[in-house]
Structure formats: C-alpha cells, structure tokens
Amino acid sequence: MSRTRRTALALGTAAAAALSVASVTAPATAAPSPLAGSTTVTPAGHAFQATLSGKATLKAGSVTVTCTVSVSTGTVPAAPGNQNAAGPVSSPISPPTYSSCTSSVWGVTPTVTTSGSWSVSMQNGSPITATMTVPTGGLVVHTTGLATCTVTAAPSAPASVGGSWANGAPPSLTFTNASVPVTVTGGFGCPTSATSSAFNAVYKVTDTTDPAQQITVGP
C-alpha cells in the first residue's frame, strides 16, 4: 500500500473515531416543552364543597371497593393567587371522606380512611384538566370479614391523580380510570400483587360562600 494511501486511510479512521466519540458525548437537545396556558379560577377566595354524584370505585387487582358517599371541601385562592399566567391554579382541600362502602368480594367489609394534606389543581384548556394530589399514605382501605387486607394509596410518595373539570351549574370534577399507586398487604383473598388501582368518581362542586355563584375555571 502506498504511503499516500496509508495516510489517507489513517486520517479517515481518525475522523470516523472523532465522529463516533462526538455522537456519544454530545448532549442531546430536547425539543422545548409547550408552555401551559393561563388559568383563572373564580370567584377568588370563595369556599366550595365537592360532593360525590353516584358512586366512587377503587379497583385493585380483582377487588373493587365501591362507596356512595364522599365529600371534600376547599377554598379558591384569594386574588391574585387564583390566577396563573402560565400554568395551573392549586387549592388545598380537606381529605375526602368515604362512607357507605361495599366490596366486590362476598363477606368482606371495607373501611376507607384519609389523612394528610390534599390538594387539587386546575389547568385551563380543552378539556380543562384537574389533578388531585394524594399525600403519602393519605388513603387507606382496610377490609374485615373473610379477607383482612390493607390497601395503602401513594405508599412511598405523594401521587398525582389525573381528572377533568367541566364548568356548569353545578360544575363537575371527573376521574375516569385514574391510576393510583398502591401497596396491598394481608392474607388469603387479598390482591397483594397489585401495585396500582383504578379510581372512578364524579363530584359536583358547589360554591358554599355564595350558592348563587359557580366555581369556574377559565383563561
């Protein structure tokens, strides 16, 4: 092989190696995320109550817990906290209460307890999205009877439960097959392999400061 050819080959190999190293070490440039739109929740500073319409279900594995009574309360942030030029507006809410609950497993009675700091945030859009934050260990289902089980939601960290909001008279907050991380402990009949549950519920929201007004989410 001629000296000129060997030199060209060596230069080509070095260039290829340099390109290979560059492709490995050069940082990837991510596409910019779209900015969230503006959100305003009104009336500012008004208290509200969310009341379950129909039934709420929490399904873990083959077991479904159904409750027909659930209530939570909260307050729209006072101005200017009820507005966000580029993102959601968040409101603290009381831990939702759940009662009149039944299990899909015969002979098993569930009890639902909630605790901690809960919140709900609204992001204007089409549709309007709602995110309920469950604090760590903030919802626990305990069953007695033929199967003694404990289901703990958000077992290791706060969990974001996605839903939607619809303005109206009254407005509604809906969760459809929303995924919630869980751990399940117990013996025979308990779905101990389940790591997530599906939550379904529709809440009607009323303005308790002035019942003639409606809680509204807009731009």
Give names to the regions the model predicted.
Residues V69-A169:
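Predominantly extracellular/secreted and cell-surface proteins with exposed
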